[in-house]
């Protein structure tokens, strides 16, 4: 039986995918974008109200959920014996991805282009680095637990490769003024990133609790003993 924490990545993926396409639908209905002129970038769909308000809310909640997932993953990898420096690099790339997602949602492209593009870089390119680092870790440390079916690892490799190729294609095609094709690459890359976050549900399938513990001082009670199916996050 899967623990309830596995619902968090799945909910994030569903929330983000459904939310982004809702923004797209509203932009089309409200004529904020014209599909006859070409397929729009995600940011263009969320440029003006009311869809810009929904866009911000969707990405803010998604960013907060992603940050919490990255923190849980950090402590899970720590309990599996991953080196601290490697684990911290993975954590910070994930948190930067979450930060970039929030920046994209709150700084619309038409108002703060430079800030918006910085957030997009963090969300897309640093985000895919987060998953590449975890793939490298699972390949390098064969003794790490590998929850889920044997095909989960190859699936992640395919998704990471496709996402990275699409992100590079997005930038190159944009520079060649092939905006519509570039936008399609952006949409597909975003969906793949959401799916990669959703696949972390497999890694969280063995977790059934998460306990926050204060650092014990002299004479204070010690935190409860570790359990293989629980995380103890020290503050």
Curated annotation (Swiss-Prot):
The keyword Cell membrane applies. It is found in: Cell membrane; Endosome membrane; Cytoplasmic vesicle, Autophagosome membrane. Keywords: Autophagy, Cell membrane, Cytoplasmic vesicle, Endosome, Glycoprotein, Membrane, Transmembrane, Transmembrane helix. One of its GO terms (biological process) is autophagy. Residues 1-8, 73-88, 138-156, 202-235 are cytoplasmic. Pfam families: Frag1. It is a multi-pass membrane protein. The keyword Kinase does not apply. Glycans are attached at residue 34. GO terms for cellular component: autophagosome membrane; endosome membrane; plasma membrane. Residues 30-51, 110-116, 178-180 are extracellular. InterPro entries: DRAM/TMEM150_Autophagy_Mod (IPR050911), Frag1/DRAM/Sfk1 (IPR019402). PANTHER family: FASTING-INDUCIBLE INTEGRAL MEMBRANE PROTEIN TM6P1-RELATED, MODULATOR OF MACROAUTOPHAGY TMEM150B. Belongs to the DRAM/TMEM150 family. Modulator of macroautophagy that causes accumulation of autophagosomes under basal conditions and enhances autophagic flux. Represses cell death and promotes long-term clonogenic survival of cells grown in the absence of glucose in a macroautophagy-independent manner. May have some role in extracellular matrix engulfment or growth factor receptor recycling, both of which can modulate cell survival. This is Modulator of macroautophagy TMEM150B. It comes from Bos taurus. The lineage of its organism: Eukaryota, Metazoa, Chordata, Craniata, Vertebrata.
């Amino acid at each position: 039986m899967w623990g309830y924490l596995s619902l968090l990545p799945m909910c994030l993926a569903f929330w983000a995918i459904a939310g982004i396409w809702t923004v797209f639908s509203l932009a089309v209905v409200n004529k904020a974008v014209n599909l006859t002129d070409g397929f729009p970038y995600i940011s263009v769909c969320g440029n003006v109200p009311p869809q810009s308000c929904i866009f911000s809310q969707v990405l803010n909640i998604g960013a907060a959920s992603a940050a919490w997932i990255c923190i849980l993953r950090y402590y899970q990898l720590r309990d599996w014996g991953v080196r601290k420096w490697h684990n911290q690099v993975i954590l910070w790339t994930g948190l930067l991805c979450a930060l970039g997602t929030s920046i994209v949602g709150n700084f619309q492209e038409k108002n703060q282009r430079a800030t918006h593009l910085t957030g997009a870089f963090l969300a897309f390119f640093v985000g895919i680095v987060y998953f590449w680092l975890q793939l490298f870790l699972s390949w390098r440390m064969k003794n790490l637990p590998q929850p889920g079916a044997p095909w989960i690892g190859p699936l992640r490799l395919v998704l990471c490769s496709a996402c990275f190729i699409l992100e590079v294609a997005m930038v190159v095609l944009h520079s060649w003024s092939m905006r519509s094709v570039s936008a399609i690459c952006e949409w597909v890359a975003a969906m793949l990133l959401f799916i990669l976050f959703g696949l972390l549900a497999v890694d969280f399938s063995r977790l059934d609790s998460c306990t926050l513990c204060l650092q014990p001082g002299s004479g204070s009670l010690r935190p409860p003993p570790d359990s293989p199916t629980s995380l103890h996050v020290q503050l």
